From Swiss-Prot:
The keyword Secreted does not apply. Pathway: Cofactor biosynthesis; adenosylcobalamin biosynthesis; cob(II)yrinate a,c-diamide from sirohydrochlorin (anaerobic route): step 6/10. SUPFAM superfamilies: CbiD-like. It is an enzyme of class 2 (transferase). Belongs to the CbiD family. One of its GO terms (molecular function) is cobalt-precorrin-5B C1-methyltransferase activity. It comes from Sulfolobus acidocaldarius (strain ATCC 33909 / DSM 639 / JCM 8929 / NBRC 15157 / NCIMB 11770). Its EC number is 2.1.1.195. Keywords: Cobalamin biosynthesis, Methyltransferase, S-adenosyl-L-methionine, Transferase. It catalyses: Co-precorrin-5B + S-adenosyl-L-methionine = Co-precorrin-6A + S-adenosyl-L-homocysteine. This is Cobalt-precorrin-5B C(1)-methyltransferase. NCBIfam families: cbiD.
Length: 355
């Protein structure tokens, strides 16, 4: 029994993203609209094929609209948005589609380079599709859904949104619907377990992917050699050495890799930043014009900074970044090392080392 208790104490609770929360509230409101039912929970589909059962409630009617809400659950991630209520109000329309809009409490994009145009509400394409897919399990067309976040504007002031160019509320995000506790120190044990599985299949190369998007595209290139590491770049290198791998390849989006290029082997924001400084330096080395460098310096995010460059210029800059990241990794590891930079849509932007 003691052994089981010790094992249970190491398990981590996963959470749900704001996108999944909004999808659950939206599905509940449409069930209320179409069927006049008020379930206590709903199940929603996710982009990775899993289904999530999420508590819903707070049903109400507002003229011809039917409303319901769900609360975000962040699991064991420290998150200011834990418990945040997202309200969805739905109504009938003459449209042959399902329309999703965001109202008070959802932020507005004010800078280029983010997932949407300037002036749009900050709902990522994947999260929006997840909401639509959830609603389609009730009705295929002819409804609209409006999203409200009562405390969104207030809480967003304490998030990264104002720093990246989203004003007036939170963002509705999520690539999988599930929030993984990837920045917790205990997650290193999970990394070790995943790496052991890769090692047991006979692979001598371990591929590291910080997040969901990089993991997805890295799997398309390297198959089952890939593990997800969150912010733990340095610790993952040590794990690879301890387990006897001969090569490690880091596959990352630009936002994480510029931190590694700056010498950060744990990329969590509590340990530092230096993203735009690194991007600016790399742009100078790559020969980018002064006019564009001045725009990069004033950017609020890596995505915005890169949006001012042509495709060719982005590749040149990312080559500098990947070379510097490789240099930093070589300082702490004697393994054969490689770095691959990929874009949000999975295109390879640059490579360095042995990949």
């Amino acid at each position: 029994m003691r052994g089981n208790t010790a094992l249970m104490s190491t398990l981590k609770r996963f959470g749900i993203t704001t996108g999944a929360t909004a999808a659950a509230a939206s599905k509940a409101s449409v069930i209320f609209l179409i069927k006049n039912e008020t379930p206590k929970t709903v199940t929603i589909p996710t982009p990775i094929g899993l289904r999530l059962e999420i508590s819903v409630g707070n049903y109400s009617r507002k003229e011809s609209e039917f409303c319901a809400s769900a609360k975000k659950f962040s699991g064991d991630n420290p998150d200011i948005l834990d418990g945040l209520e997202i309200i969805a109000c739905s109504g009938r329309s003459n449209s042959q589609t399902i329309t999703i809009t965001a109202e008070e409490g959802v932020g507005t994009i004010t800078r280029p380079g983010l997932k949407g145009d300037v002036g749009d509400k900050s709902i990522s394409p994947i999260a929006k599709q997840m909401i639509i897919d959830a609603v389609k399990e009730v009705v295929s067309s002819g409804v609209y859904v409006k999203l409200y976040v009562p405390k969104g504007e207030e809480l967003a002031k304490n998030t990264m949104n104002p720093l990246v160019g989203v004003e007036g509320g939170i963002s509705i995000l999520g690539t999988t619907g599930i929030e993984y506790p990837v920045s917790d120190e205990d997650y290193i044990e999970h990394i070790k377990s995943e790496a052991c599985v890769v090692k047991s299949t006979g692979h001598k190369t371990l591929v590291l992917a910080p997040g969901n998007t990089s993991f997805k595209f890295a799997r398309e290139i390297y198959g089952d050699k890939v593990i997800k590491i969150g912010d733990n770049v340095g610790s993952s290198l040590k794990v690879a050495e301890e387990l006897g791998f001969s090569q490690v390849i880091l596959v990352s989006l630009p936002g994480k890799l510029v931190k590694v290029a700056a010498g950060m082997l744990n990329t969590h924001s509590k340990f530092g930043d230096a993203r735009l400084e690194t991007l600016t330096f790399s742009s100078v080395v790559a020969g980018i014009s002064l006019e564009k460098i001045q725009k990069i310096v004033k950017s609020l995010s890596i995505s915005e900074g890169l949006s001012y460059l042509t495709d060719e210029e982005r590749q040149k800059v990312m080559k500098v970044v990947s070379d510097r990241a490789l240099e930093k990794l070589k300082r702490v590891s004697k393994l054969k090392l490689g770095v691959v930079v990929i874009s949000e849509d999975g295109k390879i932007m640059a490579k360095s080392g042995e990949v």
